[in-house]
A protein has these predicted regions:
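Active-site nucleophile-adjacent alpha helix/oxyanion-hole segment immediately C-terminal to the catalytic cysteine
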Residues: 1-62, 66-71, 75-76
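Sequence-level detector for tyrosine residue identity
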Residues: 12, 27, 49, 78-81, ...
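Conserved active-site-adjacent core of cysteine acyl-enzyme catalytic domains
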Residues: 56-112, 118-127
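Glycine-rich, aromatic-bearing surface loops/beta-hairpins
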Residues: 128-134
Length: 134
């Protein structure tokens, strides 16, 4: 079972669904797309891993490639939106985006990482609320 620990000062919850994580040491950074989809869709790690592997077979790429992730999210009925930022404005942060979207699942991308958001709460194995969404 995955570990969930709520931070009552924000809309962040610790979330680490990877069955190999033992509660100490380094986090597995390579599986962030899997964790993000697990959090947003309330699916277990192995199910999402298998979904991404199947998508990878269809696009002839690794399961965590951009094309594999895009196909997986499309199969899960997600719509891709780009963040539009006007000149002089800042990009939204993960925490602000989550607060402004209190209903529904979202998978968002920041520099080198992906995060799952569900009903206004963002789930990850580290506090990434300050990161800007791309």
């Amino acid at each position: 079972m995955h570990r969930v620990e709520q931070d009552v000062t924000s809309n962040y919850e610790f979330f680490q669904p990877n069955p190999s994580w033992k509660g100490k040491g380094k986090y597995l950074h390579e599986d962030c797309p899997i964790r993000a989809i697990c959090a947003a869709e309330h699916l277990d790690w192995n199910t999402v891993y298998d979904l991404l592997c199947d998508c990878g077979k269809h696009v002839f790429d690794a399961q965590t490639s951009d094309d594999s992730i895009a196909l997986c999210l499309k199969r899960l009925s997600y719509t891709k939106y780009s963040v539009k930022v006007t000149k002089g404005s800042k990009r939204p942060t993960v925490a602000n985006f989550a607060k402004e979207h209190p209903r529904g699942p979202y998978v968002v991308r920041v520099a080198g990482h992906m995060i799952g958001i569900k009903d206004g709460t963002y789930f990850d194995c580290w506090h990434c609320g300050h990161k800007c969404i791309y």
